Amino acid sequence: MADATLTRAPEGATGVLVLASGDVIWGRGFGAEGEAVGEVCFHTAITGYQEIMTDPSFEGQIITFTFPHIGNVGANHEDVEANHAHALGCIVREDVTAPSNFRAAEGFDAWLKARGKIGLAGVDTRALTRRIRVGGAPNGVIAHSASGSFDVEALLEKARAWPGLEGMDLAKQVSCEAHHLWEGGVWKLGFGYEGAEKRPSTSLGTSGDSSGEGSLVPSEVEGRSFKPHIVAIDYGSKHNIFRNLVKAGAKVTVLPATATFDEVMAHQPDGFFLSNGPGDPAATAEYAVPVIRQMLETGKPLFGICLGHQLLALAIGAKTTKMFQGHRGANHPVKRLADGRVEITSMNHGFAVERDSLPPNARETHVSLFDNSNCGLELTDCPAFSVQHHPEASPGPMDSMYLFEKFVGQLRA
């Protein structure tokens, strides 16, 4: 890592990462040209880079992929978790320029470029990951210019001026703009996600495109005449969450993050879902928590994932805290306390619920086997539960998929 006094890239370098600490990391730029400032984190998944880049929870973040080769299977028009890429950019050891997969429509480089996202290759990602692990997730600027000319001092000032994710509400930026009915199921070999989703184009988010990515096939839930109605609050949800709620047999209506309790109840829900999303839960809680508390008072079942888990905790009086460096990967072991079962899970969070702040009516249900942090809770006085990890995977293992069936089962009871 170089000193920030350098303003001209070394020979062959067309990209740079400038950290707020003053570290300058040179590499080869790919994807779109430009610059972006945000929090630099790392993700340990081997595959699923498309799903990761399009996960709304990565709004405001620059991802370091720890697996050395990224882009092996190219990119397609289906493996996305939102209608555009939310991560600011990515850092890789080596980007694969000759992908091989029967579903590939283009290379990762072209995919990033089409979405205005910056890539930086040729980086010692092991060293950068160690730096994040030891020093915490830093603010930084990623930049790509074919000319190789960068004003490093100016980039450093931008990195240092960026306020950071703590105290930042990003859910409003990535939430849908209007309510819509989610129709569809999971991906099927030979069919993919055929057919257009029946929802207005205005509800795709503030930066949505019209590419049709993530479109779904109609749900087929055999032997279930009653479909309980879930109102899902979209704080930045992944598509695969809604797919699996529908697969479990529910009807899902999605509402914006700022929906009021009256707007929620106007849809006559049987239960409530709180989605994942980016930013500081304490900031989002200012408008989300009053609504969640009213939801709990109805006595109807409630399920939360990731940010939704944190918001439920805040609604019952618990506290959240910024992690030194978050959990982001597809192989995180979580222990289910009820029976000792270990579930391998997908995780993506930089904030956590403080276990010691949980009130008496909250029971801890899951813990991380990496650092013993809280990963789940349930209330003893009403049918509400939540988990910090991502049972919908995408990418990742499916050990926790039963949670969708559990929730829909509560709605049918």
Protein language model regions, located:
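Residue-level structural signal for beta-strand termini and adjacent loop
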Residues: G29-G31, P68, N348, L379, ...
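Active-site-proximal beta-strand elements of phosphoester/diester hydrolases
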Residues: H229-D234, T345-S346, F385-H389
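Proline-centered loop/turn at the N-terminus of a beta-strand
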Residues: I118, H229, P301-F303, K319, ...
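Catalytic beta-strand/loop cores that center a nucleophilic Ser/Cys/Thr
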Residues: G340-C382
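RNA-binding accessory domains that recognize and position tRNA/RNA substrates
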Residues: A2-R199, S225-T258, D262-H267, G279, ...
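A glycine-centered loop/beta-turn motif at secondary-structure junctions
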Residues: G376-A413
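Intrinsic disorder/low-complexity segments
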Residues: M1, G195-K227
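Cysteine-nucleophile active-site neighborhood
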Residues: G271, S275-A352, G396-L411
